[in-house]
Design a protein with these regions (language model features):
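Membrane-interface helix-loop junction between the first two transmembrane segments
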Residues: 24-42
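Short, strongly hydrophobic alpha-helical membrane anchors
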Residues: 1-8
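Membrane-embedded catalytic scaffold of the fatty acid hydroxylase/desaturase
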Residues: 48-59, 65, 82-237
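A transmembrane-helix-recognition feature enriched in membrane-embedded lipid enzymes
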Residues: 27, 46, 212-220, 248-256
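A membrane-cytosol interface segment of integral membrane proteins
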Residues: 233-257
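Structural signature of hydrophobic alpha-helical transmembrane segments
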Residues: 10-23
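Membrane-interface helix termini and inter-helical loops of multi-pass transporters
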Residues: 2, 67-80
Length: 257
């Protein structure tokens, strides 16, 4: 891996370049033609994405681990002594993805957790940025579970940043409006073909395709929905949902109707 002194610069450049490439591909090979780049809620989602998502959390934890190591507070377990940074990254990605699959399923079953999660499904357009729309509580829960093991297991500090970079780029990809065909890879690796159905509001697609990075969880546990000759027609909730971050935050606490 790249030295820890330049890891933030490299990952920042990689995310920006990935975003530009995905946006260009959305315009050249759109799944839903005519979908605008600056659609409803774009700037709000961009702020959420920039300030609150996994990459920024990864940088914070990167420096936290380095600081804790500098003052002598280290985990008794040192996974970095047994695995290279790349091996650590793969282990954490697979284990965290397995957790996310089951937690995601629970979010769709639990009335309380759905209130927190429904903001993620509120966008009527699914594109490279819509995946960033998440309630603050969901972000805190997921990123605590995501990054705490890195410190508890004594991971290399840069692994947190690379993990955040992977999450950011993959999140942009699976939500992108690109008419991509992954072929047999879609049975193992998640892509836009399956994940856009997760955001579709057609009844037959509800509570399907919970995987984030590894589509194999859906195929293994019977939640895969992948109609090859159908097109996802519309997305979002069937009710009006607020667009601003503040309104979305407090909407969770509304009285039950």
């Amino acid at each position: 891996m790249i030295s820890t002194n330049s890891v933030e610069f490299f990952t920042s450049i990689f995310i920006v370049c990935s975003a530009v490439i995905i946006i260009v591909l959305e315009q050249i090979f759109p799944y839903n033609k005519g979908q605008k780049i600056f659609r409803r809620g774009f700037f709000n989602d961009f702020v959420l994405y920039t300030l609150l998502q996994s990459y920024i959390a990864g940088i914070c934890i990167f420096y936290s681990i380095r600081w804790l190591q500098a003052i002598g507070l280290q985990s008794d377990v040192h996974i970095s002594s047994y695995l290279s940074p790349w091996q650590q990254l793969i282990v954490f990605i697979v284990v965290h993805d397995f957790y996310i699959y089951w937690f995601h399923r629970l979010q769709h079953k639990s009335r309380f957790l759905w209130r927190i999660h429904e903001v993620h499904h509120s966008s009527f357009e699914v594109d490279w940025l819509s995946g960033s729309r998440s309630h603050l509580f969901e972000i805190l829960i997921n990123q605590t579970v995501e990054f705490a093991p890195l410190f508890l297991l004594g991971a290399s500090p840069e692994v947190a940043v690379y993990k955040g970079m992977t999450d950011a780029v993959w999140g942009m990809y699976i939500h992108s409006n690109i008419n991509v065909k992954s072929g047999f890879l879609q049975y193992f690796i998640n892509g836009p073909e399956m994940h856009r159905w997760h955001h579709a509001n057609q009844k037959k697609a509800l509570d399907k395709n919970f995987s984030t990075k590894l589509a194999m969880w859906d195929w293994l546990f019977g939640t895969a929905y992948f109609p090859k000759n159908e097109k996802a027609g519309s997305y979002g909730l069937t009710k009006v949902y607020p667009l601003s971050f503040i309104q979305q935050f407090f909407y969770v606490f509304r009285s039950r109707s």
